[in-house]
């Protein structure tokens, strides 16, 4: 059980610039993991296993990509009670991301806006960090944490050459991932969301599917591939994406990323900042996409629901909308690690 009341830490962190607070937190987690300091945020892992895409998830609550872009804190995050952790987004080459300031809190709406732009240390450093994780080397028996590795393209790579970056990343992370997520939905890399369009998505997923089969044959292991999509899609676009996912044998979908809409935060400080909005205002838009995906994909296609979970009830709403498992990120910032267990127990109690 966590020894540190998160309200105390949050009061201190919220007095800082949002990105500076994030970096301080990640440094603390990286230094404290695998030491007695880890008890400050340690929580029991709720047992609520589910089989999806050939994987056994220990429970239905995971960490969304974006918090730990460089895979520095896997062991620390595992101690919070997550059933699965997704790290990244990683790109082939290191890149600084967009100019600062680029992360903003909207506390009145329990939300964040970021335009980080896939800032990361690159594929080689990312893989080295994954390999250092003790959770990955030791495992946890039947309750082994699952690890998702989230891949993207470099900002300097022309959109017409994006497939090359995704294939490079897929090959690099493949031996180390329980599943891979293809991120085509961040609003903070120019033209990236164009990859969600019919022809572009068809070409990209076709190439990824082909390369995955080559890697599976060479390594004797078929790693599931998920695709992360945006909430800013109409029903026709969701239907096209669903068809394309199935046509190319993708194993699941992550719904959704951040939104570029600002309807729910108009008039608030920082509401006009460019970037992706996450947190409570995204819940209903994300759930709507999940419902549309479930209707289009049928009852068995795996859906990871993410977007706007700040309470156990929010997590349950994702499951009721059609998600099989859920992920949190902004909720962790506002509510702290205890949210993981509360959400996992509420979902378990649905049974």
UniProtKB/Swiss-Prot annotation:
Molecular function per GO: dihydroorotate dehydrogenase (quinone) activity
EC number of the protein: 1.3.5.2
Residues annotated for FMN binding in this entry: 65-69, 89, 150, 183, 228, 256, 279, 308, 329-330
Keywords: Cell membrane, Flavoprotein, FMN, Membrane, Oxidoreductase, Pyrimidine biosynthesis
One GO BP: 'de novo' UMP biosynthetic process
Required co-factors: FMN
Cellular localization per UniProt: Cell membrane
A Pfam match: DHO_dh
Binding site for substrate: 69, 114-118, 183, 188, 257-258
Reactions catalysed, as given in the entry: (S)-dihydroorotate + a quinone = orotate + a quinol
Gene Ontology annotations for the cellular component aspect, listed alphabetically: cytoplasm; plasma membrane
Family annotation (Gene3D superfamilies): Aldolase class I
Pathway(s) per entry: Pyrimidine metabolism; UMP biosynthesis via de novo pathway; orotate from (S)-dihydroorotate (quinone route): step 1/1
Active site: 186 (nucleophile)
Comment on bound cofactor: Binds 1 FMN per subunit.
Major localisation: membrane
Keyword Methyltransferase: no
Membrane topology field: Peripheral membrane protein
Biological role stated in the UniProt entry: Catalyzes the conversion of dihydroorotate to orotate with quinone as electron acceptor.
Family listed: Belongs to the dihydroorotate dehydrogenase family. Type 2 subfamily.
Subunit structure: Monomer.
Protein name, as recorded: Dihydroorotate dehydrogenase (quinone)
Name of the coding gene: pyrD
């Amino acid at each position: 059980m966590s020894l540190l009341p998160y309200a105390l830490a949050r009061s201190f962190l919220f007095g800082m610039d949002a990105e500076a607070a994030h970096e301080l937190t990640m440094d603390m987690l990286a230094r404290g993991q695998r030491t007695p300091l880890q008890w400050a945020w340690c929580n029991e892992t709720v047992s609520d296993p589910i089989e999806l895409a050939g994987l056994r998830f220990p429970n239905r609550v995971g960490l969304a990509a974006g918090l730990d872009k460089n895979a520095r804190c896997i062991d620390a995050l595992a101690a919070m009670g997550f059933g699965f952790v997704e790290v990244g987004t990683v790109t082939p080459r290191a890149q600084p991301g967009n100019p600062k300031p680029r992360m903003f809190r909207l506390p009145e709406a329990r939300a964040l806006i970021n335009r980080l732009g896939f800032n990361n240390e690159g594929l080689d450093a990312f893989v080295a960090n994954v390999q250092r994780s003790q959770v990955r080397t030791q495992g946890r028996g039947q309750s082994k944490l699952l690890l998702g590795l989230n891949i993207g393209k470099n900002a300097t790579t022309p959109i017409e050459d994006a497939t090359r970056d995704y294939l490079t990343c897929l090959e690099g992370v493949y031996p180390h991932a329980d599943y891979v997520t293809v991120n085509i939905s961040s609003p903070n890399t120019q033209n990236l969301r164009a990859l969600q369009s019919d022809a572009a998505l068809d070409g990209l997923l076709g190439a990824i599917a082909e390369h995955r089969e080559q890697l599976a044959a060479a390594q004797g292991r078929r790693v599931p591939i998920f695709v992360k999509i945006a909430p800013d899609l109409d029903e026709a676009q969701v239907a096209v994406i669903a068809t394309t996912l199935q046509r190319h044998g993708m194993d699941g979908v992550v719904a959704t990323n951040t939104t570029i809409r600002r309807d729910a935060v108009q008039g608030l400080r920082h509401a006009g900042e460019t970037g992706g909005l996450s947190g409570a205002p995204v819940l209903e838009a994300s759930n709507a996409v999940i419902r549309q995906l479930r209707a289009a994909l049928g009852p068995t296609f795996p859906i990871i629901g993410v977007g706007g979970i700040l309470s156990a009830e929010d997590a349950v709403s994702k499951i009721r909308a059609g998600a099989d498992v859920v992920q949190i990120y902004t909720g962790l910032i506002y509510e702290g690690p205890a949210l993981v267990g509360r959400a996992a127990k509420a979902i378990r109690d649905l049974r």
